[in-house]
Amino acid sequence: MFDFFRKSKYVTVKPETKQKEIPDGLWQKCPRCGEIIFNKELEKNFKVCPKCGYHFKISAWERIKLLCDENSFVEFGREISGGNPLNFPGYEEKLAEAREKTGLKEAVVTGLGKINGREVVLAIMDPNFIMASMGTAVGEKICLAMEKALEKKLPLVVFTASGGARMQEGIFSLMQMAKTVQLVNRLNAEKIFYLVVMTDPTTGGVSASFAALGDIILAEPGALIGFAGPRVIEQTIRQKLPEGFQRAEFLEQHGFIDAVVSREQQKEVITKLLAWHSQK
């Protein structure tokens, strides 16, 4: 007979509150469309979002790996590094932090390499190093690359990515604009092919000097290109800017750059341009 007065025994189960931890570094979220992308898939796709085509920022060495033939790149100018000519407070610590973070001494990597068998001089700016701002060392390395192209009669390919002049170096930073432009004039006089690829962002003193003077100027999709940022311009002129103003596609439509080329097509396009402008 069933005992209605007997108390049933219950076991209290505590709800699971601890969430499963997902290891860091497995995926990234696209800042444009919000798509969650596994890093391995992103690497295979040239660090480009497979859903919306957003181009993630990449380091100088990642770009060299994508662009140059295997084991063909030989760096020069690595010993050049910036100092603190104005004794700007905290600048030396900022440089040390950037060097530890990136493994670079400065914001641009220069060297000789081959692109589908064609030898070129390369200068590739790295936005991870103080936004690749241009100080004395960056200006010196860009000029060194130009001098190497003149010496060896080789095409020069420069990938730009910069927040502009490095404010901690003041007038010494601004002097690099004139310095690099003088070397571009020498390239023109010697008929050395000079190709610029603008990546996000290319702004300030870099956009107003050597970056805007290429024989051919390409840009990555969506790259921000201009001297001052859109917010500063709007505040100055007190007008709303057109949609996409200062983006690569807008500038291509208005004749400022020659073509917008996605990252996966760059090696092929650059190879064709080198062939068309070859002196040999």
Curated annotation (Swiss-Prot):
Residues 26-280 form the CoA carboxyltransferase N-terminal domain. GO terms for cellular component: acetyl-CoA carboxylase complex. Binds 1 zinc ion per subunit. It catalyses: N(6)-carboxybiotinyl-L-lysyl-[protein] + acetyl-CoA = N(6)-biotinyl-L-lysyl-[protein] + malonyl-CoA. Its cofactor is Zn(2+). GO terms for biological process: fatty acid biosynthetic process; malonyl-CoA biosynthetic process. Zn(2+) binds at residues 30, 33, 49, 52. Its main location: cytoplasm. A zinc finger (C4-type) spans 30-52. Acetyl-CoA carboxylase is a heterohexamer composed of biotin carboxyl carrier protein (AccB), biotin carboxylase (AccC) and two subunits each of ACCase subunit alpha (AccA) and ACCase subunit beta (AccD). This is Acetyl-coenzyme A carboxylase carboxyl transferase subunit beta. The lineage of its organism: Bacteria, Bacillati, Bacillota, Clostridia, Thermoanaerobacterales. The gene is accD.
